[in-house]
Swiss-Prot record:
One of its GO terms (cellular component) is membrane. It comes from Rattus norvegicus (Rat). The keyword Cytoplasm does not apply. One of its GO terms (biological process) is negative regulation of coagulation. Residues 1-20 form the signal peptide. It is found in: Membrane. InterPro entries: Endothetial_C_recpt, MHC_I-like_Ag-recog, MHC_I-like_Ag-recog_sf, MHC_I/II-like_Ag-recog. Glycans are attached at residues 47, 64, 139, 165, 175. The keyword Cytoplasm does not apply. This is Endothelial protein C receptor. Keywords: Blood coagulation, Glycoprotein, Hemostasis, Membrane, Receptor, Signal, Transmembrane, Transmembrane helix. Pfam families: MHC_I_3 (PF16497). Residues 235-241 are cytoplasmic.
Length: 241
């Protein structure tokens, strides 16, 4: 079940997260939120920015999401494919919630809100280590978080539950959710930021293309983990599977 579940979420995505600057450093900070008042209705919200430049927005119910590209970094045909792929993903995401509800109706708790925060930051001074992070929250409470130095997922709650322990066991089993994520955050994301500082004023079009690739890669992992949190929480009702 989990293998099929993860495979379903390995779709090419572009939106759903927020990138922003922190004081004194160059950073990428991403946030994606999905809200389900009941099994049959979902609403998604997200945006993407590079530095202080807002590049994409996403908002709306699962069956009528509005997705906008604010910067012309993808040609119309390419953007149409990206937009279509994301809408298909969101539709399948909503269908997955309904499926789990049908299977475990007595254990599902609504409303349900899942948020996924992931990013990397360059320090204001040379010689300091970059800061990278990946945190998942369910219904406003810390659920799990990623420790990049050890490539281990840990509980984000003061009181670990069987649901959280089960989730951690699954996340710490797969190379994709451990070492591939570690490499992407510590290497790919950080290197992109370093290169962006150098090239942002001289190679605008190239920056746009590399930024698109970066977002695609990060968000694949972003939605995988957010999806795992949704699936486990719905399956357990916050208690046990």
């Amino acid at each position: 079940m989990l293998t099929k579940f993860l495979s379903l979420l390995l779709l090419l995505l572009l939106l759903g997260c927020a990138f922003c600057n922190s004081d004194g450093s160059q950073s990428l900070h991403m946030l994606q939120i999905s809200y389900f008042p009941d099994p049959y209705h979902g609403r998604h919200q997200g945006n993407a920015s590079l530095g202080k430049l807002l590049t994409h927005t996403l908002e709306g119910p699962s069956n009528n999401v509005t997705i906008l590209q604010l910067q012309d970094w993808q040609d119309p045909d390419s953007w149409a494919r990206t937009e279509s792929g994301l809408k298909i993903y969101l539709s399948q995401f909503n269908s997955l919630v309904q499926l789990i509800y049908r299977e475990r109706k007595n254990d599902v708790v609504f409303p349900l809100t899942v948020s996924c925060s992931v990013g990397c930051e360059l320090p204001p001074e040379e010689g300091s280590e970059p800061h990278v992070f990946f945190d998942v929250a369910v219904n406003g409470s810390a659920f799990v978080s990623f420790q990049p130095k050890t490539a281990i997922w840990v509980t984000g709650s003061q009181e670990p539950s069987e649901a959280i322990n089960f989730t951690l066991k699954q996340l710490n089993t797969y190379n994709r959710t451990r070492y591939e994520l570690q490499e992407f955050l510590q290497d790919t994301c950080v290197q992109y930021l370093e290169n962006h500082i150098t090239t942002q004023n001289t190679k605008g079009s190239q920056t746009g293309r590399s930024y698109t690739s970066l977002v695609l890669g990060i968000l694949m992992g972003c939605f995988i983990i957010a999806g795992v949190a949704v699936g486990i929480f719905l399956c357990t009702g916050g208690r046990r599977c």
